[in-house]
Structures are given as structure tokens and as C-alpha cells.
UniProtKB/Swiss-Prot annotation:
GO terms for molecular function: 2-succinyl-5-enolpyruvyl-6-hydroxy-3-cyclohexene-1-carboxylic-acid synthase activity; magnesium ion binding; manganese ion binding; thiamine pyrophosphate binding. Belongs to the TPP enzyme family. MenD subfamily. This is 2-succinyl-5-enolpyruvyl-6-hydroxy-3-cyclohexene-1-carboxylate synthase. Signal peptide: none annotated. Pfam families: TPP_enzyme_M_2, TPP_enzyme_N. Disulfide bonds: none annotated.
Amino acid sequence: MPIAYKNINQLWAYVFTETLKRLGLAYAVICPGSRSTPLAVAFAQQAPDIEGISILDERSAAFFALGLAKATNRPVAIVCTSGTAGANFYPAVIEAQESRVPLLLLTADRPPELRDCHSGQTIDQVKLFGSYPNWQTELALPVSDMGMLGYLRQTVIHSWYRMQAPTPGPVHLNIPFRDPLAPIPDGADLSYLLTKFHPEEFFAGITDTTSLPDHSQLSIPPEWLKSQRGIIIAGVAQPQQPQEYCRAIARLSQTLQWPVLAEGLSPIRNYADLNPYLISTYDLILRNQQLATRLAPDMVIQIGDMPTSKELRTWIDTHQPRRWVIDPSDQNLDPLHGRTTHLRIRVEELGCKGVEEDKSSVSEYLQLWCNAETKVRVNVDETLDKMEDLVECKAAWLLSQILPPETPLFIANSMPVRDVEFFWKPNNLRVRSHFNRGANGIDGTLSTALGIAHRHQSSVLITGDLALLHDTNGFLIRNKFVGHLTIILINNNGGGIFEMLPIAKFEPPFEEFFGTPQDIDFAQLCTTYNVQHELIHSWVHLQQRLNPLPNTGIRVLELRTNRKIDAQWRRDNLSNFAADNII
């Protein structure tokens, strides 16, 4: 249906959103405000091609958009008014940059004549997010000129490209508007401009040309083939095609006959049948110092970001092997500053052929790793299987075995990601793990999880109480949310991760400034937001609630644990799983 343009702001916003629609934008998160009126109206008129999602709190909205972009592997736009509204995007902008997620940040602004003169709700929004965007600019003010409409169209197209290449990340457009902001006449005559503006001709040829670089297959470096003591580290990763990613690593592993040390946040552990040399208990194995010395490699291939494990990092730093990092981004992924070469490709682009498994050809070094994995895995499984008390580390181990196939799972920062690394059991459930490990903060946990779950398969979030409390405004999204999210709340009334640090021995000030108990009744909190709540009393009870998952709504399954008991359990057990494993 043709739109009757009442003013230049309306036409400008139409060109802006129509260009995005033709590029393939599917979601726009809209925060309420006056200065952004032209954009909000234009996005609303693009329904159903672009779904406009209204979210009150800008910080929550930005993390919701981040989750949507993670789940879809596509850019998501987020709109706010002028003033401090955009500043609330900042934590999500940082995470988007650090975890390489495409976000289009649209901050409406007052015109130049209303800046630096104490006009209301006006701050300096140019380069508001510092160096974090892939690209940023301020658009020109809307004017009645065909050349400027072409400038607007091409700037949007360029923004779309810069969000996705060469490395995905956020782009910030600061967009000034003069009054009137609503679609009402402004006294200007647009008739002459509109006689020259023919949408089908103007927008012809707009397509999403962003694609992965067309690399030819890269042969395996000869020195890899010569090494008999090499390991592959499959780090933190959220690949668009997880099965192909896992197959590529399996081919490399079988070609080289090297073990794959797979982080719990890597899809490798959820496609375990693809890789016969998968090592999931490396953090526990390396706590045995004698065994760790025998396992020291002379070469390491790191795929993607480094795993969370401090034990692994310390071990590599101590032995200083020759290292290669495989990742298509332009980022430095070596926080250890070792003898490292970066290959700026995807692991799928390595030209290696898998070989049939031949047990007689397995090297002594590879066999040492596989034997250690088998023994430690048995110790872990037997210990956790017999555990009846609600000790939080068992949650990750149990989830790895009982979630419905291909469930999207968001893993909160702090202790949940560590328990996943320690205890996530290799499986073939194809669970789609998501996380915010760019900057590793707890902010935006609930909102990101809701973004991941929106219009997707029923999803699960595992989080501690502080991470959830830090983002309770995310519950305000409930009326806009389409889908289901189950929140597994590990409520230990405080910051359990700090119990593992040396400061835990100092009381005071530990409990007041690090433990930080909030003493929240989560049943009452959920009632406030009209969210379902259930207190879990046993592991069997939890298992009954997780398979199958509901189709709609948000619910909280609360497990009350004791963080001091949990911390003592880790101190007593983590180093013991491989204590007698001298092979």
C-alpha cells in the first residue's frame, strides 16, 4: 500500500527502513521515545517483513537484540531516542564487538542547532560507543533532495556490509531529526521530489552481497604432519553450521592423529560421535602435575578463542609449545603471547582428508590422552551419578544428558560456564550452546537468553542468582516474547565464584563486598512479573521438568544451594579426579 509522505522525516525514515528490509533485516527492537518517532513509525509500517519489538529498558533491549542476532546469525537493529538512552546500549555493544555479533545501533538525535545549548535530553552522541563499533557515522539531516536520498540508501547498504565483514560486529548510526517528528505536514512541498522518486527503480538491485570470503583450500602445513606430540584445542565457538564445524575438526584430528581438547562451550562436546579423540576432562587431567608434564605438547592448534580453563592456560604458558591459531577474524586470539602464527581462515577451509581409524597407528602420546580421558570420565560420572544433594556442579553434568535434542541453551557467566567446562559430558544431543564470552560480564543474561529463544525452539537458561537479579528488567519482555524459556536458577544467595578466590579467607570484608547475599524471595519476584516459578527439590524433580519442555511462556526452576558447601566440594574433588591416574 503506497504511503502518503507528510514530511521529509517520514520519507527519509521510509528510505532507511525499506533499504534494510531489502537487505534482509528481519527484526528491529524499538525503545520508546520522542526523537526516534520517524524511525519507530517507519519500522512499524514494514511489518510483517520486519518484526518491530517494543522494549522499555534500553540495556535490556540491546541484550535482547544481541541474543536475536546470535540465534539467527543475522544483523538486528535497535532504536532509541536521544540523550542517555543510547548510553544504556553500551554493555551490549562491547559484548557484540568482543564476541563478533552484528548489531545495528540507531540513536536518534537532536539537530546541531540544539546541541551545546542546554536543550533538553541532548548529549554528545557522536562516537558514543568509542572504538567498539566496526564503523560509525552521523547521518545528514533529512533534506528534500534525490541525491541525498541516494546517499542515505548507500550509507545503509555500507552499514549492512560493515556489520558482517570482514569481522562481524556492531555499527552505530547517529540520526538527527528536526521537528515535526510525527507523520504530520511540516509546510514543505514534497510534490516535485516525489515525481522523481520511483521506489521500484530507486531500490532496484539492493541485495545482501555479504558472504564469507571465497578461500581456496589451504593445505596442512608440513610441520603439523611431522609432530608426534600435538594437540588441537577447540575453544569457545558458536559456528553457524555446527555440524560442519565439528566434522572439519574431526577430519583434522584424524589426519594428524592428535587429540581434541574441547571446551564445554564448543559444539564438539555435543557432536561427540564425530570425533574419536575427544578429550573433555582436560582441566581435571592437568591438575595431576606429573601427568600434565608427561602430556606436554610440542605443537598446539587452537581453533577460535582460548577455553575458559585456567589450568589449560597455565599449562600451555609453562611449556611454551609452537602454536597456531585458526580463526577468520582479524583479532589477536593469543592472550598468552606465545610463539604463535594466526591463520585467518575457517577450520572448514583446511584441505585435509579424514582417515579410517586404525588403532594400531595411534601414537603413544595420543593413547596417553585417550586413556586419561577414559579413566577421569568414569571417575566424574560415577561421583556425580551418586550425588543426591543439590550441589550446583551436578546441574551442568545432568543437563548434558537430558535436554531435548537441539535445545538452545544459554549459559550464564561466572560459575555456570566453569561448571560446563569441568563437567559437561560429551553427547550426541546437538544442543546449541550460547553465551556472552566476549567480555564475560553477567549483565544482560536474561535479556540475551530471551532474544535467543524468541521465535525459536523452546530454550533453557542456566544462571546464578546474581546474574539473574542484575537483569530482572528482562522479565518486562514477557508480553512481547514468542516462544518458551526455562530458567534454571542456581540460587546460592550470592557470588559463588568468589568463594573459590583467595579473598574468601578474609572475613570481614568478604561476605559484605564479595559474597553480596541479596536474600531475595524468587517466588515473590516471579509473581510480580507474572512468571511461573517452581522450587526444585531433587535431581529427579529437575529431570522431570526438562524433558519435554513447554512450548510457550517463561518459567523459573529454582535450585537452592549452599555456595560455601559447593566451594568446599570443588576444593575437595577437582584435583582428585585424576590424582591416581599415572599411566
